[in-house]
Amino acid sequence: MKKYLILFLVPLTLISQEDALVEEVIVVGTKASLIAAIDKQRESDKIVSIVDSDALGDFPDTTAAEAIRRLSGISIENDQGEGRYVSIRGLSSDLNSIAINGALMPAPEGNRSVLLDGLPTELLDSIEVSKSLTPDQDADSIGGRIDFKTKRPTDLTGELIKIKIDTQYNEQAKSNDNPRFAITYGDKLSDTFGHVLGFTYSSKQIVSYNNETGFGWETNSEGLKELNDDWEMRYYDLTRERLGFTYDANFLTSDVTSIYISAFHNEYIDDELRYKDEYGKLGSIGTTTQSSMFTDRIRHDAETRVREETRTISAFNIGGETIINDWNSEFQLSYSFAEQDDTDNADLTFRCEVRAKKDSCVNLKSPLVSGAVGEINFSNPRKLVLNSYYPEIYDPANLKFKELELEDSIIEDSETALKLDFSKDIEVGGNPAVAKFGLKYRSREVDVDKNKSFYEDDRTMADFNPSQLSWPFPGQVFSQQANPALVYALQNQTDSLTLDGQETYLEDYKTTEDIFAVYGMLTSDLENGVLTYGVRVEKMDMSSSAFDQDGNPTKASSDHTFVAPSINYKHFINENTLLRTAYSRSLSRPSFNSTAPVLELEITGEDIKGKYGNPDLDPYESDNFDISIEYYGNNLSYLSVGAFLKKIDNAIYKTIQKTATINGVSFNDGVETWINAED
């Protein structure tokens, strides 16, 4: 199938100055923005990569993650073709820290990974990725630190108006009403005041078809691969809307004192319809070849999910700079907030299962063909083909109402921080240097409130006006699916259904994390280089509360102190070539989900399984070594070669015990938790 993607871009930048007679229309190309990024990278005293200014809009990037991936050592994890999580040097996104204008971004999922697919590039002026750390940066950055910055009024020379409008056409989508526009207005109203306002809106429809086989592949006694778990075919039809604004203002109150404010707000709405055809409990019998197998069981689930998820990220800063007794003094008070709202989610599953010599949803033929109910061909493991000997499993009248799941969940993550920095020009060994010290206090709170209700009914899919989807992969059968409007309406019809269970507190928890940090550092200009070194100390106190299986509150707490020395050296080999070396210690704290004292249960007959959090987890700790050579040639040519080594202790991973007793609950079918590797 041919696919077409067409983009229409209409950028316009107007800049006027007070002494100009007419307005100028200035087109700033990739060259100008590339010069700015390379200059900043070259002048930095640590190892960084930078995307600057209009380069963010030169490509059809939808999200901030997609803009970052153009930098060396950066990869991203996509969702529905859009960049979502960022990996620095191949490490988990949980091991990064991300900030907007200096305010650390929270993560509205209960972990440390920050979702970036809701953050549009139009709101940003530059992105800086730090791969080595200095003591004035937060230590929780084993992977690295990503700083997003909006346009500052101090960069203005006059009035600025920037407008961008684009759209796209995609043959896969049902609708091509995909507008995206952004406007930036700024003005330096006087020698003492300037401000910048930005606004952006976009809407994009995405349609996708995929096959998923999970981790069900095993090697049998003959050394052949076979699928012994499940396989899914999925269809997505979703619309993603992004709305955001920024406001920055700068006040010069005297020759040595300035105050600034910064506000950032972004809202992301994901309106999703998902059809899923799942074939589970597949068991190999009889002949298995390199490309196929017989199965004595097929569990066919047809699922319709209608969901609208809203994510919000906000950051607010007020700060200033002045001189006190020859010390340049800076302060910043920041508040950041993230929320994930899943209060509009309906998921309905229908099931028809056939099993050899056991109860089935359809009458089995007698005798069975080789004791099998079907055959699976996996000559193409990315696109399996099921030959069911019982096509009745696709009949809506045989697909019985299995379960309706309604979710009403909200996750909130917020952080308040205050930092003070003091620096002064001095001499060390006859060389100019800058002494700097400071302190920072951060208080973070994560509040998870998940509510799920499960319902049963005696109807079949035939009662939900099913329809057949056009499936693009030859040989595969995608069954009919329930009408999504009727599924969505069930949220207001629960009185006519049978309540099968509720989860109102089992996954709920609240965690508070307080971090106090102090640091000292020195930056010395040497004859052929720059040396930056110092130490940072961070003390963390964490407290968390949840509920046990009876609804009684449980509490847990932990604390630790971390010492983080670092040294960065930039050596000038010649006018165009730099050698950089760096050493630092850093950490990454466990996810909130893994440390909260949450005990989740799943009871099936006499079998009890579940998972629980481990408040005693230690953070990842890492010794980081870096070396790189950078060449800056003429005509914007740039070349760098680097290597790094990270020695990471206290790695965190999941473990499963077959039996265990926790908080009075005896598990006999497996219990999952998190532990440190040294344990």
Q: What is each stretch, according to the model?
A:
Residues 65-104:
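Extracytoplasmic beta-strand/coil segments of soluble accessory domains associated
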Residues 26-57, 85, 93-96, 103:
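N-terminal periplasmic "start-of-domain" segments of outer-membrane beta-barrel proteins
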Residues 614, 618, 638-679:
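Outer membrane beta-barrel strand-and-loop segments of large Gram-negative receptors
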Residues 291-298, 358-403, 449-508, 658-675:
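Flexible glycine-rich, low-complexity coil/linker segments exposed to the extracellular/periplasmic environment
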Residues 103-131, 183:
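Short acidic/polar hinge/loop motifs at secondary-structure boundaries
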Residues 64-67, 84-87, 99, 115, ...:
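N-terminal periplasmic accessory domains that precede
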Residues 252-256, 262-263, 317, 334-336, ...:
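Structural signature of Gram-negative outer-membrane beta-barrels, strongest in the C-terminal barrel
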Residues 174-281, 301, 309-319, 325, ...:
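Transmembrane beta-barrel wall of Gram-negative outer-membrane proteins
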